[in-house]
Amino acid sequence: MARKALIVKQQKPQKYKTREYNRCKICGRPHAYLRKFGMCRICFRKYAHQGMIPGVKKASW
């Protein structure tokens, strides 16, 4: 879990546009962010296995 202080700090408007970055909407993780789903890879995997993301299923070939 991300520290609460870092999440709050990131939500403030930044002085420069390049300082803005995405965080997972669920856990606040800043790395491995999937833009299409708005969450990190770990949360994506957890929610996909639970079937909570519509249209996503485990690949098999």
Curated annotation (Swiss-Prot):
The keyword Electron transport does not apply. One of its GO terms (biological process) is translation. GO terms for cellular component: cytoplasm; small ribosomal subunit. Keywords: Metal-binding, Ribonucleoprotein, Ribosomal protein, RNA-binding, rRNA-binding, Zinc. InterPro entries: Ribosomal_uS14 (IPR001209), Ribosomal_uS14_bact (IPR023053), Ribosomal_uS14_CS (IPR018271), Ribosomal_uS14_sf (IPR043140). One of its GO terms (molecular function) is rRNA binding. It comes from Thermoanaerobacter pseudethanolicus (strain ATCC 33223 / 39E). Disulfide bonds: none annotated. Pfam families: Ribosomal_S14. SUPFAM superfamilies: Glucocorticoid receptor-like (DNA-binding domain) (SSF57716). This is Small ribosomal subunit protein uS14. Binds 16S rRNA, required for the assembly of 30S particles and may also be responsible for determining the conformation of the 16S rRNA at the A site. The keyword rRNA-binding applies. Zn(2+) binds at residues 24, 27, 40, 43. Its cofactor is Zn(2+).
